[in-house]
Amino acid sequence: MDLLSDIEKQLQKATAQGFLIALSGGLDSTVLLSLFAKLRQKQPHLPPLSVRAIHIHHGLSPNADSWAKHCQDLCDQFQIPLIIERVQVDKTNGIEAGAREARYQAIKKHLQTQEILVTAHHLNDQTETFFLALKRGSGLQGLGAMQQQSVLFGMPILRPLLGFTRTQLENYAQKEKLNWITDESNGDNRFDRNFLRNEILPKLRERWAYFDLAVQRSAQHCFEQQQLINDLLSEAFAEHCQIKNQFKLCQFRKYSLAKQTALLRMWLAENQLEMPSKRQLTQLINDVVFAKEEANPQFQLVNKVIRRYQDRLYLTKPFSDLTKYCLKLEQNTLSLPDDLGNLSVQENEHNLIFHWQDFSVTLEKTNLPISIRFGYSGKVKHHLKRPREDIKKIWQELSVPPWERNRIPLIFYGNKLKSAVGFFRVFDEY
């Protein structure tokens, strides 16, 4: 089956109303763009096949500007709208990883509802991905490599060229007289993927002509086995993960280590996190899951933090220390730090009504300066019929996790705490 008819059949099965093509300007994505342009002309779609393209300008090469212009010229030729998005690459975890993260986050920003991202990964890419997973010591999920349709970074992705080799794409490009750019970094074997592509895999293909197809079969076996495990664990997983970013630990200790790690991996995958290594997962289980009950353990995983409180794991972002903030309320609206939103105040004849997120509290008017602070230690009287109690005990009774306690706006009249917005009022002086 040729490229055009195969992709045509794939698109007939797709439920998307539009397609966003990831266009680098290289051979693979240029072929993909050409195929979609042909399909749009060939198929009597009512409405017409909706196709857009996006080019990510990483700024890593001195040729990046000329690549962007090439992509624009290409899209003008095919009459396909193009988005050019410039990104900053965080090189903390390596250029490859940083560029990939920046690329997909930029694409996610532009992907529309009912639109699917289309990438030009082919059979040779699949082999490289499998070997890189093997190098990392990945399990079934990693060795499952890429699927023709999947979800990545929360985006639906279609890879219609996954069953074709690079040679087949080259033959098509030459037949259609297509022009494409070549990234000079492709020859740099310091990058693992380039080392495999340029040094290792050509020798394996020379020895075994159908090596890529064999790797694809193995990857598919791994994917199917992982799907089977997920199916078998689905009932248990539903019991432990009733809220997406939380994981209940009740009965968890009774499971085998294999079942524990499988369930945690499912939870991390549900939250679209990269899979931790086996060492990291073991550390998570030992240091967080099974930490002492009174402990407040946490585990950093890329840009997220896993915390435990009252027999439950929580997935949060890293939080800033807000305890030194003292914000004067001089207008009706105050912007709070660390993405906590706005706190606003309304006034009537006798009272001030403070609003924050879905919470509100009504306090008497005052001539004292009003400030918003975070974090407090000491005893307060939060109930008319109860004596003063340590604020830590109050938070515990309200089941507020330790890391959230210092993120709740505290209203002060002068130097006197009057309320933790949405949780309690203070009824006496201290």
UniProtKB/Swiss-Prot annotation:
GO terms for cellular component: cytoplasm. The keyword Magnesium does not apply. It is found in: Cytoplasm. SMART domains: TilS_C. ATP binds at residues 24-29. The keyword Transmembrane does not apply. It holds the Pfam family TilS_C. It is an enzyme of class 6 (ligase). Disulfide bonds: none annotated. Ligates lysine onto the cytidine present at position 34 of the AUA codon-specific tRNA(Ile) that contains the anticodon CAU, in an ATP-dependent manner. Cytidine is converted to lysidine, thus changing the amino acid specificity of the tRNA from methionine to isoleucine. HAMAP family: tRNA_Ile_lys_synt. Belongs to the tRNA(Ile)-lysidine synthase family. This is tRNA(Ile)-lysidine synthase. It comes from Haemophilus influenzae (strain PittEE). The gene is tilS.
